[in-house]
């Protein structure tokens, strides 16, 4: 069993469209363990830190307005290769390039409303988890089905 963690956020469009349970179930069904979850409306400051590499880009003001337009479900998942596999479960950033069966391939059509965010590396995951969650908000617990998932 791996203790690798990733940050997955269901963006305002995913929350407003009632997709939370379907998205969470994709990760649970795969065998990943949920260790952090909260519904938040992020501040501009938090989003500027989260998307620091995009702050100077022309699309950033529109993205910032969208990401502060409603609640986001912030989650932390744990398990073997969860960062890479989380990206596979989500699908390509541009939903039109996402395969059917992925979250974005099934639920999104527009890159500006692509339902979810997922960490793109182990390092990014740790940075994002630290931004969105306090240490005491993450729960270390035993998933009893682990022996049915891992050798």
Curated annotation (Swiss-Prot):
UniProt name for this protein: Nucleoside diphosphate kinase
Function: Major role in the synthesis of nucleoside triphosphates other than ATP. The ATP gamma phosphate is transferred to the NDP beta phosphate via a ping-pong mechanism, using a phosphorylated active-site intermediate.
Annotated family: Belongs to the NDK family.
EC number(s) on file: 2.7.4.6
Cofactor list: Mg(2+)
Lineage: Eukaryota, Fungi, Dikarya, Ascomycota, Saccharomycotina
The reaction(s) this protein catalyses: a 2'-deoxyribonucleoside 5'-diphosphate + ATP = a 2'-deoxyribonucleoside 5'-triphosphate + ADP; a ribonucleoside 5'-diphosphate + ATP = a ribonucleoside 5'-triphosphate + ADP
Catalytic residues identified in the record: 117 (pros-phosphohistidine intermediate)
Record keywords, A-Z: ATP-binding, Kinase, Magnesium, Metal-binding, Nucleotide metabolism, Nucleotide-binding, Phosphoprotein, Transferase
Class of this enzyme: transferase
HAMAP family registered for this protein in UniProt: NDP_kinase
Family matches, as InterPro entries: NDK-like_dom, NDK-like_dom_sf, Nucleoside_diP_kinase, Nucleoside_diP_kinase_AS
GO terms of molecular function: ATP binding; metal ion binding; nucleoside diphosphate kinase activity
One Gene Ontology biological process: GTP biosynthetic process
Taxonomic superkingdom: Eukaryota
Organism of provenance: Eremothecium gossypii (strain ATCC 10895 / CBS 109.51 / FGSC 9923 / NRRL Y-1056) (Yeast)
Entry binding sites for ATP: 11, 59, 87, 93, 104, 114
A Gene Ontology cellular-component term: mitochondrial intermembrane space
CDD domains xrefs: NDPk_I
């Amino acid at each position: 069993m791996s203790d690798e963690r990733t940050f997955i956020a269901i963006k305002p469009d995913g929350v407003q469209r009632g997709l939370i349970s379907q998205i969470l179930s994709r990760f649970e069904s795969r065998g990943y363990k949920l260790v952090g979850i909260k519904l938040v409306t992020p501040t501009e400051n938090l989003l500027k830190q989260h998307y620091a590499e995009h702050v100077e880009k022309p699309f950033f003001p529109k993205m910032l307005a969208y990401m502060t337009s409603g609640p986001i479900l912030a989650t932390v998942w744990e398990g073997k290769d969860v960062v890479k596999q989380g990206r596979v479960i989500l699908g390509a950033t541009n939903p039109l390039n996402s395969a059917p069966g992925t979250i974005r391939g099934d639920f999104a059509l527009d890159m500006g409303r692509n339902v979810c965010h997922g960490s793109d590396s182990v390092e990014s995951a740790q940075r994002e988890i630290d931004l969105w969650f306090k240490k005491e908000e993450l729960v270390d617990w035993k998933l009893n089905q682990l022996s049915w998932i891992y050798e």
